[in-house]
Amino acid sequence: MKKANAWSLALFPFIGLWLGAAPAWGAAAPALSEVRVFKVESARCTESIPDRVTTTQMCTHRGPTQVSVMEVGLGNNSVGRFNGAVLNARRTAVCQVGNISQACNGAGQLMGYIYVFDLNVEGPGGFEYSNSSINPPRNTLKTQLNIL
């Protein structure tokens, strides 16, 4: 049997420190269970979008507009589109801390993301967001909103 040398044994404390700072890898990531637009904001108005509503209703959005999407669970293929054009987004992780959902700051369990898409609305159009779950059942969820 081969003896371990001092250098290989010296690595164990460092590996332990590294693993101690890592997240709980054994915890299952939550499957993607919901995606929905919850806010549309332009110079004309800020509109909260209730669940199952498919069209903006408070005002006619034009010019620079932000569309906010809530994602519950974790996905790995997020795509936002306006009138078919792929959009870039800013993403904020959301964690569950007790009974409160908040932006992740090192505490709590990751439960999803908020995506904010910047678009320029020149006329009525369709916004669509989709993502696929990172784990079984690996479903793809989609939400659509007509922006007037």
Positions of the model-derived regions?
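Aromatic sugar-binding surface patches on proteins
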Residues: N99-F117
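Cysteine-centric segments in proteins
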Residues: R81-A85, A103-C104, I114, G126-S132
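Aromatic/hydrophobic beta-strand junction motif of beta-rich domains
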Residues: H61-G75
